[in-house]
Structures are given as structure tokens and as C-alpha cells.
Amino acid sequence: MASVVLPSGSQCAAAAAAAAPPGLRLRLLLLLFSAAALIPTGDGQNLFTKDVTVIEGEVATISCQVNKSDDSVIQLLNPNRQTIYFRDFRPLKDSRFQLLNFSSSELKVSLTNVSISDEGRYFCQLYTDPPQESYTTITVLVPPRNLMIDIQKDTAVEGEEIEVNCTAMASKPATTIRWFKGNTELKGKSEVEEWSDMYTVTSQLMLKVHKEDDGVPVICQVEHPAVTGNLQTQRYLEVQYKPQVHIQMTYPLQGLTREGDALELTCEAIGKPQPVMVTWVRVDDEMPQHAVLSGPNLFINNLNKTDNGTYRCEASNIVGKAHSDYMLYVYDPPTTIPPPTTTTTTTTTTTTTILTIITDSRAGEEGSIRAVDHAVIGGVVAVVVFAMLCLLIILGRYFARHKGTYFTHEAKGADDAADADTAIINAEGGQNNSEEKKEYFI
């Protein structure tokens, strides 16, 4: 069963009709229901709006919208329930409110130069039966008014811990502070103070500095919804440090020190502040008499073995002192190589031949084979020569034994054959008596 909700004026009329006499009561009720039928109802209509977030000093836009409007009256009220606009009429005398659009389905109003005091709920009302109401919340963002960075000491010494503070004042909501040293993010400790809906944030950073931090920026960067881009401030660190000492040998260029050579060393010292004094000393001994000192340079001419030792360069400034050592060792002078001789050449040639054999194994094998062949041939030749010698000896002995017989045969053909026979007999008798041989061999 549907119920009809009467406006407050209709409810009063109904109460009066109930107190009237019965005949008049019926007439008043009929008149009342007829009047209620002429008032628009909220059936099918929907009033809606959206919240607004705006940065201080900018423009906020408030829109009251109606779906399926039947030309009902729309009005806008401020947080104090004062009417800003009734339809297209502005009862409130605040020129910052301006009508942007008015129709049966929308009432759109702008608020310029928004301040923190404008924050709150704004109400949209639709005059239906029953009336509808919706509200929008305006949130005002306030960026930090001032960003300050404060460093405990303008000039620090390496190894010292310093305090750095960064303050973001009067923001809404509270600001988030981030710390950077160069490109490295660091972690600080923040404290928030609230005053009259505004926030002041102070972040503290404890930083131990080193010589590498000299000239490096310390950056305080804020993050806030009212800030676009990077809002930051920075301070450059100034760090003092003791000297850094390095010894460089400028002569001899090859780096090997020998007797008779010269030595030149240069001491490089870098510090902050710049070292005011650079000195050379010889550790555990006196500096050679022939050594020459000229500022950061040490020059020793005509080196000898007595110059061996450790040479130290010392540098100092107001922060401290440092040193670097150079150990000198003098080598013997280079020996003179004698010119090559015939013997040396022969030895070199022999060595080269051996290396060639070792490098190529096949050449060695062929040489061995050739050596074996020559030995065999030499042996054969020797045997042949020996055989020929033996043959000659045998032939010589043979001819020597048969020499008389040869002459005897030659003599047989002669007239004195008898004498030849006598010679043969004597020859066969041997050679024991040389006189007998002379007697028969005429």
C-alpha cells in the first residue's frame, strides 16, 4: 500500500480539517488531497553531486545535477546553510560565486580565489515531495609556504658528523620530506606541528662526511599533492681533509735505476686546504750529499749503491699530515757484450745445426740413414782394398818363388841346355847358401 507524504503545510491543514464539524471536514479533506496532487513528487528523480579538491587560490566548481528532471527547483547552500543560489538567483552577497550553468537538470557554480576558510560541505537541494538533498565536500590544498634548509657547520672536517635540518612551513596536508646526497637517497627523522589546520614539518638528517663529499649537494625535496614537479632546496658540502700524497718517478723513463744514472722524483700532494709544506726525507738515514731538493722535486745525480734506501715525501695542512714512500734500489750498470769471434761463429753454427735437427725429426732420421749408408759403403770399399792388397802380396810372393823356374824355361830353348839344367837343380836346392846360388846362376 502506497503512502503519500504531505508537505508540512498540508499536514497542518489536515489537522485543522480533523477538528472541523463532520460536513465541513469532508470538504476540507477533498480540497487538501486535490492541492497535494499538484505538488511534484520525487519519484524517478535523482539528485547527485561530486566532491571537489582545489589548490588554494584557484577555482572550485560545484555542480548539482538531476536525472530525469521534471523542472523541480534546485538550490545551493554553503556550509553555514546560507543559500548561495536559488535557481538562477544569488541571495548571498559574495561575488566570488558565479553562475556557470542553470537548467532543469543542473545548477553549476564556480568559486574563485579559494581559501582555507572555504573548505567544508556544500548542500544541493531539490524541491520535490519529499525534498531531496545531497552534499559535496570542498577540500583545499595548501602547498608549503616556505622551504628552508639549515646546516650545522658551513665547513666540516672529514670523519665529522654534522646535523642538517629542513623545514616546510604552513602546508595542508602535512608535507613529506626526502633527503638526497648527490643521487643517493638518505633517511631523516621528521616532526610535524599543527596550528590552525596548517602543518609545519621539520626533518633532521645526521650526516658523517668524508673527503669525497666535498662539493656534493645535500638536497631537501618535498612531496605534496598541491606541488607539481620537484620543489627542493639544497646546500653544498664543504669538507676539509688532510693531504693525499703520491710520488711519481719522472726520470729515468724506463723505471730501472742503475749505477751512474740520474733519478728524479716528483711529490704530488692534494688536500683541503692545499698543503702549505712539502718535504723530502730519507728514512733511517741522511739524505745523500749529491741530492738536490727543489720544492716537491727530488733529484739525485750519478746514482751508486750507497743511495739505496727509502725516500719519503711528507705534506701537511691544518687538518693533518700524510706521507708516501719510495724505495730506491740501484742496479749494476749494464755489461758490455764483446764482439763476435771465429770460435763464436763456429759454435753458433753448430748450435744452429743441432736446433734444426731437434726442430725437424724427419731431417734427423734422413741424416741417420745417410750416415748408415756411408758406413756400409766405406766398409765394403775397405774390404775390397784389403782384398786387393792381399792379392798383390800373394802374387808378389808367388812371382818371387817362381822367378828361377821362369828363367830356366826360357833357357831350355837355347844351345846351352846342360847349363840350364844345372841352374834348375841349384834353384830347387833352396837358398840356404848364397854362394852356391852365385855359382850356378850365371
From Swiss-Prot:
Residues of the signal peptide: 1-44
Q: Which UniProt keywords apply?
A: Apoptosis, Cell adhesion, Cell membrane, Developmental protein, Differentiation, Disulfide bond, Glycoprotein, Host-virus interaction, Immunity, Immunoglobulin domain, Membrane, Phosphoprotein, Repeat, Signal, Spermatogenesis, Synapse, Transmembrane, Transmembrane helix, Tumor suppressor
For side Cytoplasmic, which residue ranges? Answer: 396-442
Extracellular topology: which positions? 45-374
Q: Which residues carry this modification: Phosphoserine?
A: S434
Q: Which residues are glycosylated?
A: N67, N101, N113, N165, N304, N308
Could you tell me where this protein is found in the cell? Cell membrane; Synapse
Q: Which residues carry this modification: Phosphothreonine?
A: T422
State how changing T408A affects the protein, per the record: Strongly reduced affinity for EPB41L3
One BP annotation, GO = spermatogenesis
Disulfide-bonded cysteine pairs: these are C64-C124, C166-C220, C267-C313
Domain Ig-like V-type, residue spans: 45-139
The record ties this protein, via Gene3D superfamilies, to: Immunoglobulins (2.60.40.10)
- Per the record, what is one GO cellular component? cell-cell junction
Ranges for the Ig-like C2-type domain?
Answer: 144-238, 243-329
Q: Which domain of life is it from?
A: Eukaryota
**Lipid bilayer topology:** Single-pass type I membrane protein
Which family is this sequence assigned to? Answer: Belongs to the nectin family.
What is written about domains in the entry's comments? The cytoplasmic domain appears to play a critical role in proapoptosis and tumor suppressor activity in NSCLC.
Subunit details? Homodimer (via Ig-like V-type domain). Interacts with FARP1. Interacts (via Ig-like V-type domain) with CRTAM (via Ig-like V-type domain); the interaction competes with CRTAM homodimerization and CADM1 homodimerization. Interacts (via C-terminus) with EPB41L3/DAL1. The interaction with EPB41L3/DAL1 may act to anchor CADM1 to the actin cytoskeleton. Interacts (via C-terminus) with MPP2 (via PDZ domain). Interacts (via C-terminus) with MPP3 (via PDZ domain); this interaction connects CADM1 with DLG1. Interacts (via C-terminus) with PALS2 (via PDZ domain). (Microbial infection) Interacts with herpes virus 8 proteins vFLIP and vGPCR; these interactions are essential for NF-kappa-B activation.
What protein name is recorded for this chain?
Cell adhesion molecule 1
In which organism is this protein found?
Answer: Homo sapiens (Human)
